[in-house]
UniProtKB/Swiss-Prot annotation:
Annotated Zn(2+) 1 binding sites: H78, D139, D196
Name listed for the protein in its UniProt record: Peptidase T
Positions with a binding annotation for Zn(2+) 2: D139, E174, H378
Cofactor details (free text): Binds 2 Zn(2+) ions per subunit.
Organism taxonomic ancestry: Bacteria, Bacillati, Bacillota, Bacilli, Bacillales
Cited CDD domains: M20_peptT
Classification via SUPFAM superfamilies: Bacterial exopeptidase dimerisation domain (SSF55031), Zn-dependent exopeptidases (SSF53187)
One family name in Pfam for this protein: M20_dimer
Family: Belongs to the peptidase M20B family.
One GO cellular component term noted in the UniProt record for this chain: cytosol
């Protein structure tokens, strides 16, 4: 199985599939079609029917092999890779029996144990790394390889009973648009799992509540030599707004269930300044309070300088999927049971981010997130354990089998 996983993952990551937030199409980049079309061919070679729509949502079915009435379970992964670092000309490196020391990549870049102490978990494992010049794309191509390998394994082992399985590969997750054209009725599942986590054992069913914020300040630009009581400096208004937010409630000072305000971009001059933020919080109450806080600061500036001086636009992006998943405890209990049977220590923690499951859960498809075995996503230090990819496959198989047993 390890060789199949290596072959699949290395063939997927060399295909550049980065998404593009500035694009208005779906997929946002044509190059995502290259991997989608390859996957369609691979699925058909397994003897399964596939269908892909105009937006690049590739769905397929493994029929049930039991007479029981089993919930239809979906498996999902995304084909696009992050825009944080280049994904062009990925050159994966395979390290057999990792010795536990610093890893020197071809570029000379080092994955140092002092900076990345989790490397100690992988001594003796087969690792796949970058060459130091690109990201790897294990997020989420490791998940794709694991789904494909799990489906192939079930076909080869008909003695493992399971219900109807739907699986799919989707575009544009990394830019937050993965579910925007996702047809839940066409996917036709009771529940689903994204295979989009990281370290072995991760099981995630809580995500942030998320919003995007755009703030604009309009100043009055007057020659500084005669500006008294006339000039309104938009940059100073921007500074006032930012300094009115809690200084410690930012990504670099928060963890776990703690939320934050994150200033993403600042542009401006005396006449006009624009700030872009994201708001994140696991608590819906605190999430709403953060939005109120921003509105209150804007109102105070408007009261002093006029309504035209400040404008804020807040758009909710997604909500904590835990609200939709916890009413279905089997979605959590079954993976926990399977992991323990595989001697995998579960890591149940909130996602400090979002997955496609965050939006899909609110579209009527409760979708927790399972581990893939990867680390340090979105940059040149990214790597994945093939040993843990194999465990991820058996975790998927075990979950599907357990749903059938409990039906």
């Amino acid at each position: 199985m390890k060789e199949k996983l290596i072959d699949r993952l290395t063939s997927y990551v060399v295909i550049d599939t980065q998404s593009d937030a500035s694009s208005t199409t779906t997929p946002s980049t044509d190059k995502q079609w290259n991997l989608l079309n390859q996957l369609k061919q691979e699925i058909e070679q397994l003897g399964l029917e596939t269908d892909i729509d105009e937006y690049g949502y590739l769905f397929a079915t493994l029929p049930s092999n039991t007479n029981k009435d089993v919930p239809v379970i979906g498996l999902l992964a995304h084909v696009d890779t992050a825009t944080d670092f280049t994904g062009t000309n990925v050159n994966p490196q395979i390290i057999q029996s990792y010795d536990g020391n610093d890893i020197t990549l071809k570029s000379g870049l080092k994955i140092e144990t002092a900076k990345f102490p989790e490397l100690s978990l992988y001594k003796g494992h087969t690792l796949i790394t970058t060459d130091g010049t690109t990201l790897l794309g294990a997020d989420n191509k490791a998940g794709i390889a694991e789904i494909m390998t799990a489906i192939e394994y079930l076909i080869a082992h008909p003695e493992i009973k399971h219900g109807k399985i739907r699986f799919g590969f989707t575009p544009d997750e990394e830019i937050g648009r993965g579910p925007h054209k996702f047809d839940v009725e066409r996917f036709a599942c009771d529940f689903a799992y994204t295979i989009d986590g990281g370290r072995r054992g991760e099981l995630q069913y809580e995500s942030f509540n998320a919003a995007g914020v755009n703030v604009t300040f309009n100043g009055v630009n007057v020659h500084p030599g005669s500006a008294k009581d006339k000039m309104v400096n938009a940059l100073n208004l921007a500074v006032r707004f930012q300094s009115s937010l809690p200084a410690n409630e930012v990504p670099e000072h928060t963890e776990g269930y703690e939320g934050f305000f994150h200033l993403m971009e600042l542009n401006g001059n005396v006449e006009r300044a624009q700030l872009s933020y994201i708001i994140r919080d696991h608590s819906r109450e605190q999430f709403e309070a953060r939005k109120v806080k921003m509105h209150e600061i804007i109102t105070s500036i408007q009261n002093e300088y006029g309504e035209q001086a400040a404008h804020i636009e807040i758009n909710d992006q997604y909500y904590n999927m835990g609200e939709k998943i916890t009413p279905h405890p089997q979605l959590i209990d079954i993976p926990l049971e399977v992991m323990k049977s595989l001697n995998i220590e579960p890591i149940v923690e909130p996602i400090r981010g979002g997955t496609d499951g965050s939006q899909l859960s609110y579209m009527g498809l409760p979708t927790p997130n399972l581990f893939t075995g990867g680390e340090n996503y979105h940059g040149p230090y990214e790597y994945v354990s093939v040993d843990d990819m194999e465990r991820a496959v058996m975790n998927i198989v075990g979950i599907l089998q357990k749903f059938e047993e409990k039906a």
